[in-house]
Design a protein with these regions (language model features):
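N-terminal, positively charged/glycine-rich alpha-helical extensions of SAM-dependent methyltransferases
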Residues: 1-3
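Conserved alpha-helix/loop element of class I SAM-dependent methyltransferases that forms part
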Residues: 5-24
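Class I SAM-dependent methyltransferase SAM/SAH-binding core
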Residues: 27, 33-82
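A short acidic, Gly/Pro-enriched loop at the edge of an enzyme's catalytic core
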Residues: 80-92
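A short, aliphatic-rich alpha-helical micro-motif
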Residues: 20-21, 41, 86
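A short beta-strand submotif of the Rossmann-like class I SAM-dependent methyltransferase core
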Residues: 94-97
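Conserved acidic residues
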Residues: 24, 45, 90
């Protein structure tokens, strides 16, 4: 039996209610395996997902749907010391990042 995380898509419904991703540059902090990233990336302009865990980033990169190849990038980075210039993103997403 396969366990489905959030089969009702509650997470993405809440995110879309509070943020308009259409054409936006999005930074997802603590992107993990990319499970949530893919759900909004189709409408975003560009998504950069960062995480500290290389195993999760590897899964996110390998499992990335091919239609999102040119829109989603993953990098190992610490949210305390972001390796980006100011105002690089329009929206920041922190979901389940402790």
């Amino acid at each position: 039996m396969t366990v489905q995380i959030d089969p009702e898509r509650t997470e993405i419904k809440h995110l879309q209610r509070i943020a308009d991703f259409q054409g936006k540059r999005v930074l997802e902090v603590g992107c993990g395996d990319g499970r949530l990233t893919w759900r909004y990336a189709g409408s975003a302009g560009l998504v950069t997902g960062i995480d500290l865990h290389p195993d999760d980033l590897r899964i996110a990169t390998v499992d990335l749907p091919s239609d999102l190849d040119d829109k989603v990038f993953f990098a190992r980075a610490d949210s305390v010391y972001l390796p980006f210039v100011k105002k690089s993103f329009d929206i920041a997403v922190l979901a389940w990042s402790f």
